[in-house]
Structure formats: structure tokens, C-alpha cells
Amino acid sequence: MKIGVFIPIGNNGWLISSNAPQYQPTFELNKTIVQKAEHYNFDFALSMIKLRGFGGKTEFWDHNLESFTLMAGLAAVTSRIKIYATAATLTMPPAIVARMASTIDSISNGRFGLNVVTGWQKPEYEQMGMWPGDDYFGRRYDYLAEYVNVLRDLWGTGKSDFKGEFFQMDDCRVSPQPQADIKVICAGQSDAGMAFSAKYADYNFCFGKGVNTPTAFAPTAARLKIAADSEGRSVACYVLFMIIADETDEAARAKWESYKAGADTEALAWLTEQSGKDTKSGADTNVRQMADPTSAVNINMGTLVGSYANVARMMDEIATVPGTEGVLLTFDDFITGVENFGERIQPLMKSRADVCPQTAASREVA
């Protein structure tokens, strides 16, 4: 099973709590995280894009770096780990993104991939005069399909004459073309998003569900397989989880309870308000799950809380879900979290025996 790190491009990572570590996003922080991830044989690093935060007393995600320029810098200071940036497709024409991707492909020597997002938080785009109107909620994947068609034209042939509703290319050129096949990923979870990923994406990210319920996302993975089968394609599922680990279950649980107790209610109220703006996409979107009050303090991503050994066991359970190729990880404290994963969790995982062969051999002897 492949492992990636969802790096903290925004302040405070993914915990909306005054009791969680408080920090600003910097290149140096993310360089340290990704270099440590590479040292421990993580397979990839992904950064999101966020153009406006949630506010509140923690100023959650009010401070963000930009994804492409950050990942270009990280590509230059790594050598093996794959690097994924995120394109906010309402803000950048596909021909520009195609050229930027080709540039980072050159910097990384073929290690670059692209995550594409349609945009769900209206104020991010409205503040710049770039929101196309609320009808966009119902048509955003039509827009994204045309966008990816243009990208693949330009990466594949260096030229596009694509004519669609949203984009019209006229002998558009991009050269040099990327040296490696640039993988396109999406995080579609609604029916429309899943249909898009089934037709156009190489991988699809989905949210894990619940606390210490590592296989609860299985129905989402099954939906993806059905959608991909209908297109005659194979699209791997990658699932998002947060790890909160310590020497004992009790110590890890105490941290989790503290984070929940310090939840930034003002920032969470903003998230809930924004999640209600999309009345077109149904109840199964990522943002609706993020705003669910059950575990909103970490936007309801799947959460693994426990001792290093128990987290390793739950990670192996994730690997048993059909169609699951990898896990995208966040941590309550990223630098310590990546180190502990590499030193204390990964060596215990049967699903990572390929990167820890000596540890796997010792388990078999025992």
C-alpha cells in the first residue's frame, strides 16, 4: 500500500482547535516534512490550495502558501518522492497550468502530478470577482471535464484545438512537453464527482470515516469501482486519514479529547455556513462530510487514534478494502508525526513490508 503526506500548506494543518499546535505555513516547515517523508520512503506528497480561510480565534486557514510554487520548490530539494500540486481551476486557464506542470516535471525529473479541484467555497473566488454564479455548483464537473481534456491535449501532443462550452483553443501550444505521464487526481465523492473521476482521473481521493473505523470508507471505494467499471477503466482509490499516535492508547486519546475540547466554534460555523451554499450536488459531497458536527474539529476526515502498534494494525486494515491503493496522511504534529510513523508505525505494518523488508522478515521469524 502506498503512503502519502498531505502537507500543511495552510496554518495549523487540519485541526480547527486552539488546543492543537498553532503554526504558520512556511517553505522551511514543508521542506522538512517532505524531506523526512522521503527519508522514510513515503511515496508522494500533496498540497491543497486554499484562497480564503474560515476565520475564528485560530484564524483557521487564513494564512496559506500557493500550491504550484511551493511544490516546485519542494521538487528541487527532493529526489525520489512524487510531488502533487493542486490547481484551483477557476483561477488558472488550463494552458497555463499545462505549462506550469511541464516546468515542475522538468524540475522533478518526472515526479510531478496534478490534483484538480472545481472550487466549493464561494468566497474564495467571489473576493477576486471570479465566481461564475451559483449555477456553477451544478455544472462544475462539466467545466472540469473540458479543463482536463485541454490539459491532456497539450501534454500529449503539445497542441490543442479543443472547442467546448467553457474553453476554446486555437492552435494552442505547450512545449516542452512533460517527460513523464502526468497523473491527474481528483477528490470526487458526490455522484457527479465520482463519475468525473471514473472517466478522467488516474486516482480518486476519498475521506476516511469515523474514529478508529479504518474500513468504514469501503462503500465509497465500491462506488468508485462501479463507476470506473462502467467507463471500462481502472481508477485507484486513495483514502484520507489523520493519525494521532502515542506510546499508549490512553495518551493518544487524551490528545484527541483535548483537540476536540478546544474546537474553534467560530471557524466551524463558517465551514457549516459555506457547506450549505451548494444546493445542487446532493448530500454526499466532501464539503458536507467536512461540516458534519460528529468530528468537525478535523473536518471529519477518518481519524486513527491510538498506540503506535494499534495504529499500524488499523493501517493494515485499510489495505484490505478492495480497490484501495494508498493512504494520504495528515498528523496533529507533522514533523513528529512523520518521524513516529517512519520509526514506530511503518515497521509494524504488513502492508508496508516492501519498504521495511528487514522488519517483515523478523516478524515472520517470530
Curated annotation (Swiss-Prot):
Which family is this sequence assigned to? Belongs to the NtaA/SnaA/DszA monooxygenase family. RutA subfamily.
Gene Ontology molecular function, alphabetical: alkanesulfonate monooxygenase activity; uracil oxygenase activity
Can the keyword Oxidoreductase be found in this entry's annotation? yes
Residues that, per the record, bind FMN: I49, K50, N115, E124, R140, Y141, S190
What is the top-level taxon of the source organism?
A: Bacteria
Q: What PANTHER family does the entry give? A: ALKANESULFONATE MONOOXYGENASE, ALKANESULFONATE MONOOXYGENASE-RELATED
UniProt xrefs under CDD domains: Alkanesulfonate_monoxygenase (cd01094)
Please explain the role this protein plays, according to its UniProt record.
Answer: The FMN-N(5)-oxide reacts spontaneously with NADH to produce FMN. Requires the flavin reductase RutF to regenerate FMN in vivo.
Alphabetically list the UniProt keywords.
Answer: Flavoprotein, FMN, Monooxygenase, NADP, Oxidoreductase
An example Pfam family from this entry, by short name, is Bac_luciferase
Q: Where are the transmembrane segments?
A: none
Q: Which NCBIfam families match?
A: RutA
Gene that encodes it: rutA
| UniProt-listed Gene3D superfamilies | Luciferase-like domain
Q: What is this protein called?
A: Pyrimidine monooxygenase RutA
- GO BP: any one term: alkanesulfonate catabolic process
Entry EC number(s): 1.14.99.46
Provide the catalytic activity annotation. Answer: uracil + FMNH2 + NADH + O2 = (Z)-3-ureidoacrylate + FMN + NAD(+) + H2O + H(+); thymine + FMNH2 + NADH + O2 = (Z)-2-methylureidoacrylate + FMN + NAD(+) + H2O + H(+)
